[in-house]
Regions:
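Periplasmic polypeptide-binding modules associated with outer-membrane biogenesis and secretion
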Residues: 1-302, 306, 315, 323-354, ...
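Gram-negative/organellar outer-membrane beta-barrel architecture
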Residues: 4, 8-10, 20-21, 38, ...
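Outer-membrane beta-barrel domain signature
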Residues: 16, 77-79, 106-108, 163-167, ...
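C-terminal outer-membrane beta-barrel translocator/porin domains of Gram-negative envelope proteins
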Residues: 277-278, 294-303, 434-611, 623-624, ...
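Secondary-structure transition into beta-strands, especially the periplasmic turns and strand N-termini
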Residues: 408-415, 530-538, 614-616, 658
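In a subset of proteins, long, contiguous C-terminal domains/tails are tracked
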Residues: 493-494, 503-506, 519, 528, ...
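Hydrophobic alpha-helical bundle architecture
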Residues: 606-614, 637-638, 651
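Outer-membrane beta-barrel transmembrane domain signature
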Residues: 628-645
Length: 691
């Protein structure tokens, strides 16, 4: 009750005989919780350098009443107040006031069931760093150590910074003195800062270093992998027996195992065993907890004039090798880290199936990731007279792709170079819906995609707490018209491409232009994750895309365009190869013309906070700001015409269902050109994707 602000709670315990047994008693607990008491004001005294307002801001968990602040209550909790007092003194020490202390603090209960906190502070004088000498170092010289320490003579004294630059407990891969030794074999090293003298306002230090003996990794083992085969794990482990010990390799191993997606990233624990300073060896055992890696979807219903059914599954830890092993089907053969996905969907007017397979480790020590996919889609026209599908009017799209990706070593091994060759075949018969510029004909799309990406996000791929990702990709077809020299500038004057009345036959012209699609597409995505405080994470993201043509006479293709706005969930029915770009706060695809955009940009700032990160379900809340728009050319591009929005939402990730979520977003701008009224509120449901 006191943690909820009921400081005057009273509890009385009474016992009465129990009629059931002679030796039994009933206990009655009478609780009078009283009124909730909130902090009315926080008063400081003795502070001369920093204002009351500044010091109140350093009390992270103890806040006085403030109208409109809903995210932090003004209740008083003893433990939180004690922690805040320590933070307050640390703030003074960071600014050079080493002797700062809280002389006294008191609580005054007011008549209106509120309280006043009074804090009396003695700031003391400001100190500065004097001489900083290194003692005991032989591996690194003084200059190298000073570069890492980052503190110079004459700097304002900062005990918190000094401690952090020697060993940062909150950041395992920090650039500090301890990690300098730990990352280069000196597991048994120890570093201590000792104050040797204080002259007036100057403090002199010695950094005493015991380098110890070089250490090597001895036995490396894993436990807890009940489904995943050992070889899948060991190929990701950076700590090798016989190699020099490196803390950085241990941290990187934890990150790589978490990125696999097969284990609970919050429970990956490297356990140091048999640490022997005499022999200079250490064993490491990685403790793992398997997480679900399969998603199955079976749906059925009636709507749109007929039965709608879909079936799909995605197995992220599949094993082709165990296909013939009947005992391995539980419900799928698992353990080799492969990804297998299959989806079937059928209605009266639409049927589609797709298959994809990814082998993440094709080859030996320098492997490639191999991927392949197949898909086929048929869409029939709706007959308004019969209410049924007219199978004489249809569109069919068949596609396949094959890809290779390789992790690079330069600039660093967070980089990946991927390449994909894709072919799509479009067959249209009497399909005059406006989706394509021609309703009879065929089109072929043979393209090559190359992408350079870097991903150094921290361990948990569902909720990264640091790091960044970026991808720069280019998608290209052959410049057929430049190779063949075919002239598309004057097709309208050719009688073959004219209607009987002499007017240009636009559909026939477009069929000639786009029988083999000719284009290039450039895209960029950059995402950064920054820890604000504790588990509060800021995600910032920027996206850009451009679709261009080699031959201006042939023009831009009606396929592969960008459609901006909404939840981004219409990819399944993107029949013309369009890319649906989510921008919350606006209706789906409302920020592009009917024909789509050739250019788009988008910016996102999103605050995330986890509610739970358990293997069974990861849940986090978010609030965001977004802006972006679609354009028809670079000449029309104007970043000041971006459509802005803000909102909040929640994400739930369950291994069996993938990512689910809902967002409530307010669009601040109009989707109708020339109008200024805001679009207003939109609700977006998120299934199986992440922004």
């Amino acid at each position: 009750f006191k943690k909820d602000g009921f400081l005057n709670v009273k509890v009385n315990l009474n016992t009465i005989p129990d009629s059931v047994g002679k030796n039994n008693l009933k206990m009655l607990i009478n609780i009078d919780r009283g009124d909730r008491i909130k902090i009315n004001s926080i008063d400081f005294s003795g502070n001369e350098v920093y204002s009351n307002f500044k010091l109140k801001g350093k009390l992270k968990n103890t806040k006085q009443k403030l109208l409109g602040r809903f995210w932090k209550k003004s209740k008083f909790i003893d433990d939180d107040f004690d922690e805040d007092k320590e933070n307050l003194i640390d703030f003074f020490k960071e600014k050079g006031y080493r002797d700062a202390r809280i002389v006294s603090d008191s609580i005054i209960i007011n008549e209106n069931n509120s309280l006043t906190l009074k804090i009396n502070i003695e700031e003391g004088k400001r100190y500065y760093f004097g001489d900083i000498k290194f003692i005991g170092n032989s591996v690194y010289n003084n200059f190298q150590l000073r570069q890492i320490l980052g503190i110079k003579k004459g700097d304002p004294y900062n005990g918190v910074l000094l401690k952090k630059q020697i060993a940062n407990d909150k950041k395992p891969d920090a650039n500090d003195l301890t990690n300098l030794y730990q990352n280069n074999g000196y597991l048994f090293s120890s570093i201590n800062a000792v104050e040797v003298s204080a002259e007036e306002d100057t403090i002199n230090y010695e950094i005493r270093i015991n380098e110890g003996k070089l250490a090597q990794f001895n036995k490396i083992s894993v436990v807890g992998n009940t489904k995943t085969n050992d070889r899948v794990i060991y190929r990701e482990i950076r700590t090798k027996p016989g190699e020099l010990y490196s803390k950085d390799k241990v941290v990187r191993t934890v990150r790589e195992l978490g990125q696999l997606g097969f284990f609970d990233p919050e429970q990956i624990s490297p356990d140091f065993k048999n640490v022997d300073p005499n022999s200079g060896t250490v064993d490491i055992e990685y403790g793992l907890v398997e997480a679900g890696a399969s998603q199955v979807e079976i749906q059925g219903g009636y709507g749109g004039g007929g039965f709608i059914g879909s079936f799909g599954f995605s197995v992220n830890n599949f094993s082709v090798q165990n296909l013939k092993n009947k005992k391995a089907w539980t419900p799928f053969p698992m353990g080799d880290g492969q990804t297998l996905s299959l989806r079937l969907q059928a209605t009266q007017f639409y049927n589609a199936y797709s298959f994809s397979f990814i082998e993440p480790w094709l080859g030996g020590r320098q492997p490639f990731q191999f991927s392949t996919s197949f898909s086929h889609t048929t869409q029939y026209r709706y007959d308004y007279f019969t209410g049924r599908a007219d199978k004489s009017q249809y569109m069919q799209i068949s596609g396949m792709s094959i890809g290779l990706a390789k992790r690079l070593r330069v600039p660093d091994d967070y980089f990946t170079l991927s390449q994909v060759i894709q072919f799509q075949y479009f067959d249209l018969k009497n399909y005059f819906t406006g989706l394509f510029t021609f309703g009879d004909g065929k089109a072929n799309n043979l393209n090559y995609t190359i992408a350079l990406s870097r991903n150094n996000t921290f361990t948990n791929p569902i909720f990264p707490v640091g790091g960044s990702t970026f991808t720069l990709s280019g998608k290209f077809t052959l410049p057929y018209s430049l190779i063949t020299g075919e002239d598309f500038s004057d097709l309208a004057s050719n009688p073959f491409y004219q209607l009987p009345n002499g007017e240009p036959d636009v559909q026939k012209i477009d069929q000639a232009k786009f029988s083999w699609l000719e284009f290039y597409k450039i895209k960029f995505n950059g995402t950064w994750y920054t820890r604000i405080i504790d588990k509060l994470i800021l995600k910032t993201q920027t996206d850009f895309g451009f679709l261009g043509a080699y031959n201006t006479d042939r023009g831009n293709i009606p396929f592969e365009r960008f459609y901006v706005g909404g939840d981004g969930m219409n990819q399944t029915f993107a029949m013309d190869g369009r890319e649906v770009i989510a921008l919350r706060g606006y209706p789906n695809q409302s920020l592009s013309t009917r024909d789509g955009s050739l250019l788009y940009n988008k910016f996102t700032a999103e605050l995330r906070y986890p509610i739970t990160l358990k293997p069974s379900a990861s849940i986090f809340a978010l609030t965001f700001l977004e802006s972006g728009n679609g354009y028809n050319s670079f000449r029309n591009f104007n970043p000041f015409e971006s459509k802005r929005s803000a909102g909040m939402g929640i994400r739930i990730f369950m291994p069996a269902f993938g990512l689910l979520g809902i967002d409530f977003a307010h669009g601040f701008d109009s989707i109708i050109p020339g109008q200024t009224s805001p679009n207003g509120w939109e609700t977006h449901f998120i299934i199986g994707q992440n922004f």
